[in-house]
Amino acid sequence: ALCGVLYLQTPPNCGAIEFKTKHKREIIYPYPGLLIVFPDDLMHRVLPNEGDGDRVSMAFNFWRMLK
């Protein structure tokens, strides 16, 4: 399965998304139109929005349905 997020509105200081594995940490600072797709078992979290505006994003999950 895959997960993803599409950022629609990202005011200043709206918070980043962090991905972690056993050996690595990656922080991505979003911008409008950014689409991130990642494996569903990848540890992730969204850092707090410390800005004045609203961060608007759409998160989604894809999985294969077996017949």
Which stretches of residues belong to each language-model region?
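Catalytic core of non-heme Fe(II) oxygenases with the double-stranded beta-helix
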Residues: A1-P48, G53-S57, W63-K67
